[in-house]
Regions:
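Extracytosolic low-complexity repeat regions of secreted or lipid-anchored proteins
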Residues: 85-137
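Intrinsic disorder/low-complexity segments enriched in polar/small residues
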Residues: 6, 27-29, 102
Length: 137
């Protein structure tokens, strides 16, 4: 009887930590994602005389992971990869504004709108103002 109680306690403890271990494993795996895991196509386009980084996201980026930490890690990782690849492009500037626009698109446009157009000519505003202006302040 004591052995059964011990085994039950062990089973309960193991199942209690499954979400923790799954999130930890997934978070570690996020760092192995590459630029191509997140983006179908990224190109500079000119619209109405304004340069824009046109971003077509893949499902890896727009998927709802059901865990804010995992979602945030994907957003952060993907933006770092995007910035590292394009920050030396002649049209890239205003990184903070680009980051706000990107975050807004990831969080609110997701897969409902593609491409996402990040415009480096836009000034940096607060994130709440960026949201109010539908990601392009």
């Amino acid at each position: 009887m004591t052995l059964i109680k011990i085994l039950c306690c062990i089973a309960i403890l193991c199942f209690s930590f499954v979400p923790f271990f799954n999130a930890t494993v997934e978070a570690k795996a996020i760092n192995s994602h590459t630029y191509n895991d997140y983006f179908k196509k990224v190109t500079w386009i000119k619209r109405s005389g304004v340069w824009s980084l046109s971003v077509e996201p893949k499902a890896t980026l727009t998927k709802n992971y059901g865990n804010a930490n995992v979602q945030g890690a994907h957003t952060s990782r993907s933006y770092k990869l995007l910035e590292n690849k394009h920050k030396k492009d002649k049209y890239w500037k205003n990184s903070e504004s680009m980051a706000n626009q990107y975050l807004c698109h990831v969080q609110f446009a997701g897969s409902m709108k593609s491409p996402w157009n990040l415009e480096p000519s836009r000034k940096k505003y607060s994130y709440s103002y960026t949201l109010k202006k539908k990601c392009n302040p």
